[in-house]
Amino acid sequence: MNLLRPKLKYFILAILIIAADLYTKYLANTYLEFAQSLKITSFFNLTLLYNHGAAFSLLSNDQTSWQMIMFSTISLIAAIVLIYLIIKQPITEKINLFSFALILGGALGNFYDRAFQGYVIDFLDFHIGNYHWPSFNIADSAITCGVVILIAASLFTKKKS
């Protein structure tokens, strides 16, 4: 346990992301009408949607049980790999640890939805005029931020010789 103590904050971050994700999805599901946009700004709405597909609603028209099982399994495997990476990553690799925690929290937030509801709740709707970016949620945001940070770190960090 002493080996994990310095990394505890990264697991706490993942748990906080899961909590924020599930709570905001609960609020969206409770207070928003399905597929009805609540205008917040000229470029942002809250719109409750149920995503049976992958990220950004890919494959969402094919609502089969194999698809739910496949996406749930992928999320669970990703979470296990990320937990392993956090445990094995040197404590000095803070950017990687932070990124892994973001991705882990997001993966588990969406896994929960798929496993217990059969779909992921999306509600954040950004748009320019009539062009809408696919709706997403806090978990998707955490995953995206984690991946972008990992890519940026790999591009802009000098390798140790």
From Swiss-Prot:
One of its GO terms (biological process) is proteolysis. The chain crosses the membrane at residues 8-28, 40-60, 67-87, 91-111, 136-156. InterPro entries: Peptidase_A8. Its main location: membrane. Its EC number is 3.4.23.36. It catalyses: Release of signal peptides from bacterial membrane prolipoproteins. Hydrolyzes -Xaa-Yaa-Zaa-|-(S,diacylglyceryl)Cys-, in which Xaa is hydrophobic (preferably Leu), and Yaa (Ala or Ser) and Zaa (Gly or Ala) have small, neutral side chains. It holds the Pfam family Peptidase_A8. The active site is at D122, D140. Belongs to the peptidase A8 family. HAMAP family: LspA (MF_00161). NCBIfam families: lspA. This is Lipoprotein signal peptidase. It comes from Francisella tularensis subsp. holarctica (strain LVS). The lineage of its organism: Bacteria, Pseudomonadati, Pseudomonadota, Gammaproteobacteria, Thiotrichales. The gene is lspA.
